[in-house]
Structure formats: structure tokens, C-alpha cells
Curated annotation (Swiss-Prot):
The active site is at residues 78, 158, 182. Its EC number is 6.3.5.7. PROSITE patterns: AMIDASES. It catalyses: L-glutamyl-tRNA(Gln) + L-glutamine + ATP + H2O = L-glutaminyl-tRNA(Gln) + L-glutamate + ADP + phosphate + H(+). Belongs to the amidase family. GatA subfamily. This is Glutamyl-tRNA(Gln) amidotransferase subunit A. It comes from Rickettsia bellii (strain OSU 85-389). Heterotrimer of A, B and C subunits. HAMAP family: GatA. Pfam families: Amidase (PF01425). Transmembrane segments: none annotated.
Length: 493
């Protein structure tokens, strides 16, 4: 029998319903795995007592044949989803001891469906990063190692703890957030399915804000079917979130295994020119194209002419929104407060924010404040918003001709911890292929599609028009079926 912590969400639900094992046994198997691999630093707060209590309640529900859609399934939550009575830090010193008195919309939805929370996962501070190295709790180590090198690798960011937890079999699924690629890029680096829904599909209520017009909850799983199951539980209108879309929750599981014959899939190969993509990833892109052709899809060459400006646009808009959102952390209302004798209010603000924020967060606050200043707002912020509209228009034009778009999730495989740390611009380019869809608010997924020559996982990204999560899953399922001979599992786990 497969180890319980290695079961998928779907297989776990099946086993629980058939009384093959209990939720408590399932949770204990995950706790054992978490304890075994603490060196990866995937979790910052463990909630084992809560998980065991929820598991007992789940087992009682199964005994009475009254189970809900996620009854007894162990999951983890990125530490920017507020959890009532449980520390929520966004991995920043300024919120290190913050305990919210309310529950985020997404975690509440999962609890309402019977989910069991194992803990809160590590992340880049305030979700600002691409390697999970800016956390106040230290960096996360990927469960993966290259075949030719035993060096520790990054799991990607900012949702690196969630990616490491699911990849290392320390959670069946894990919540992440995706602002410019923070679910899809880590999923690519760790061999997972990482899904970002349409902007507004999932409630942002109770999510610690980074960039409000871009932030969206996402999910890490080890299969496309699991992704559809979790999404159906997460999605839903929330009147407490002004950006929440008021629509019925779609039925997504029927997309799995559905034929893609006759689907038109757009491929913007011109985005791969100029040597920015590693050869292994270019090879995977072409092999995935052939795989989809064999499955009956029609491949169409398309152009996204403004996508190349995505990174520049993002690093104006996101820091601008962050500088506004993070102004609330002033040492007065909640969070860290640093005081000294005879200190003025201005000095308290300065010392608190200097002590509470890390270097990357300070960098982005300063960039954001600069581009919003009266002297430069027209030149940077307003111009960036105009180009953002052009990026979205490119996608709209493409979707007039195609049903889905195929792109790599990242231009590189996972890299060594510390390798790109001293050059922020190189780090920012990791989100080259994920940012455009975020700027347009589109649903997208990273699905494992190959291994590099060094044995590291590589992800392909599927993007569809707004609210078309169904076809995203449909194409992702076809890719998954085409590479089922590849084992996306780190050695030793």
C-alpha cells in the first residue's frame, strides 16, 4: 500500500470514504513527514493539535456517512492567509507575533468543506521574492536535488514553503498566493501543479496584501485532478472583498481527461528568442507542442507583442500598490512597535519600520513611493497602467483566435540558494513568463512537463481567457497524461 502521506487528494478521499484508513491516521502520517524534514524549513507555524482535532471530527462524519467534499484532507496554508487564533506573520518581523481574530475567506471555505490544517508555510516576506530567501524565519530548501550536484536549491517564491511541503509529501495540498507568478514559478521548480484562478474568483478577504490589483489565492497539488477538487472548494463570492466575482462555483472536475481534439492552442514562440530561455526548457516547450498535436489540438503561432514589457510594468505597479498597502504597519495599531525613551512619533515610525521590514520589502516600498511621487507619477505609474492595458489587449486579441495559450512557467530550472541573491534584476526576470497573465487577471496553471538534463522538474504554463478555468484544466490534464511516464518525485522522499 502507498504511504498515506503520498496519496493524492482524490485517492485520500476515496480511501477515507471506503474506511481503508482514518483521517487521524492520514494526519499522523503527514506530521511524521514534517518532523522528519524540518531542515527544509517549509513550515513556520505547526497546528498539529488543531489538525488532530479536525481529523477526529472528520472521522465522526465518515462514520455517520455525512462527509463533505474535503472531509479529513490535510492541507497547509501560506502564512499570509489570516487564521483565527493562529499566528499569521507574512514572514515579516513587523507581524512576527500577530494573531488575527478573524478567518480569511479562502481558509474558511476549505474548513467549511472539511479540510484539516497542518500549519502555516514559509514564504518570502510579504510575498516579495522569487526564491523564498527573504523570510524572517530563514530560507526554504527545495526537496529536489540535481543529479550532478548535491547543492541546496531554492523552491521558488514567494510561496516556496507551500511548494516544498507538497513536493516533499508534508501536505496533500497547500494554499499559495500568486501576484506575479508566486504559485506557478515554485510549482515549476518543484514538479507540482500550481494553479492561479481568474482575478476575483477567490476571496482576498483576510489575505495580507501585497499588490491589491494583482493578488490572488492559488493552490499547489501533485495532480491536475487534485487541483480541480481544491479549486471547487476555494472559489466563491465573498461580499467582504470588493473585487470578488459574484458567480456560481463552476464544476471543474469534469475537465479532467476531457478530449482536447479540435482545441486551438496559441504558442508565442517569439517570446523565447534572444537566449533568455535555457535549452532544456525550449526543448520541453517544443515537445509539449507535439504532445498536444498528438492529442488532437491545433497549434497556432500567435504574437503577444507587449508581453516583453511585463516585468518592467509589474515592477512599477506592484511596488506602488505595496507602498500604499504597507503604510498601515506603523507600530501604532498592530504588529511590531519599537520604542525608546523620549522618542517622538516620527522617530517611532522610522525605527519600527526600519526594524520590522527586510531589505527587499524596503526596496520595493522605496520604488513604489518614488513612482507615486508627484514628479514621476505620469512618467512611471500612469504609463505602466497604460502598458498593462496593452498587455491585456494582446491576450484578448489572441483569445479571439485560440482557446488557450502555451508558455513555459519559468525561463530556468531551480537554481542554487544564494546564486542570484545579489542581483535583484536577474531575480525579477524569473517571473518573465508568469507576469503577463497576472497583469491581465487570467486563469493559468503550471503543470510538470519534463525534466532537465540535471534531473530537475520543468513546468509548462497554460493560460485561458477570464473565468475559463475549465479549459485551463482540460489542457493541463492532456499535458499530464502525455508525460505520465515521468516520475515527478524528489529522491529520498
Amino acid at each position: 500500500m502507498t504511504e498515506l502521506n503520498k496519496l493524492s487528494v482524490a485517492d485520500s478521499l476515496k480511501g477515507l470514504k471506503n474506511k481503508e484508513f482514518t483521517s487521524k491516521e492520514l494526519v499522523n502520517a503527514h506530521i511524521k513527514q514534517i518532523e522528519k524534514h524540518k531542515n527544509l524549513n517549509a513550515y513556520v507555524t505547526e497546528t498539529f493539535d488543531l489538525a488532530l482535532k479536525q481529523a477526529e471530527e472528520a472521522d465522526q462524519s465518515y462514520a455517520k456517512n455525512h462527509s463533505r467534499t474535503l472531509e479529513g484532507i490535510p492541507f497547509a496554508a501560506k502564512d499570509l492567509f489570516c487564521t483565527k487564533g493562529i499566528r499569521t506573520t507574512a514572514c515579516s518581523n513587523i507581524l512576527r507575533e500577530f494573531i488575527p481574530n478573524y478567518e480569511s475567506g479562502v481558509t474558511q471555505n476549505i474548513f467549511n468543506k472539511g479540510g484539516v490544517m497542518l500549519g502555516k508555510t514559509n514564504m518570502d516576506e510579504f510575498a516579495m521574492g522569487s526564491a523564498n530567501i527573504t523570510s524572517c524565519f530563514g530560507n526554504v530548501i527545495s526537496p529536489w536535488k540535481a543529479l550532478d550536484d548535491g547543492a541546496d536549491l531554492v523552491p521558488g517564491g514567494s510561496s516556496g514553503g507551500s511548494a516544498a511541503a507538497v513536493s516533499g509529501f508534508m501536505a496533500t495540498a497547500a494554499l499559495g498566493s500568486d501576484t506575479g507568478g508566486s504559485v506557478r514559478q515554485p510549482a515549476s521548480f518543484t514538479g507540482l501543479v500550481g494553479f492561479k484562478p481568474t482575478y476575483g474568483r477567490c476571496s482576498r478577504y483576510g489575505m495580507v496584501s501585497f499588490a491589491s490589483s494583482l493578488d490572488q489565492a492559488g493552490i499547489f497539488t501533485r495532480s491536475v485532478l487534485d487541483s480541480s477538487i481544491m479549486l471547487e472548494a476555494m472559489i466563491g463570492f465573498d461580499e467582504r472583498d470588493s473585487t470578488s466575482i459574484k458567480m456560481e462555483v463552476p464544476q471543474l472536475q469534469p475537465a479532467i481527461g476531457s478530449s482536447i481534439k479540435g482545441m486551438k492552442i496559441g504558442v508565442p514562440l517569439s517570446l523565447g528568442e534572444g537566449g533568455i530561455i535555457e535549452p532544456d526548457i525550449m526543448k520541453m516547450w517544443h515537445s509539449t507542442i507535439e504532445l498536444l498535436k498528438d492529442a488532437g489540438a491545433e497549434i497556432i503561432d500567435i504574437s503577444l507583442p507587449h508581453a516583453k514589457y511585463g516585468v518592467a510594468v509589474y515592477y512599477v505597479i506592484a511596488p506602488a500598490e505595496a507602498s500604499s498597502n504597507l503604510s498601515r504597519y506603523d507600530g501604532v495599531r498592530y504588529g511590531l512597535r519599537v520604542e525608546k525613551e523620549n522618542m517622538s512619533l516620527d522617530e517611532m515610525y522610522e525605527i519600527t519600520r526600519s526594524s520590522g521590514f527586510g531589505d527587499e520589502v524596503k526596496r520595493r516600498i522605496m520604488i513604489g513611493t518614488y513612482v507615486l511621487s508627484s514628479s514621476f507619477m505620469d512618467a512611471y505609474y500612469l504609463k505602466a497602467q497604460k502598458v498593462r492595458r496593452l498587455v491585456a489587449d494582446d491576450f484578448n486579441n489572441a483569445f479571439a483566435k485560440v482557446d488557450a495559450i502555451l508558455l513555459p512557467s519559468a525561463p530556468t530550472e531551480a537554481f542554487r540558494i544564494g546564486e542570484k541573491q545579489n542581483d535583484p534584476t536577474i531575480m525579477y526576470l524569473n517571473d518573465l513568463f508568469t507576469i503577463p497573465a497576472s497583469l491581465a487577471g487570467l486563469p493559468c496553471v503550471s503543470v510538470p512537463a519534463g525534466l532537465s538534463n540535471r534531473g530537475l522538474p520543468l513546468g509548462m504554463q497554460v493560460i485561458c481567457k477570464q473565468l475559463d478555468e475549465y479549459n485551463v484544466l482540460r489542457v493541463a490534464s492532456a499535458i499530464e497524461a502525455g508525460v505520465k511516464h515521468i516520475k515527478f518525485e524528489p529522491v529520498g522522499f
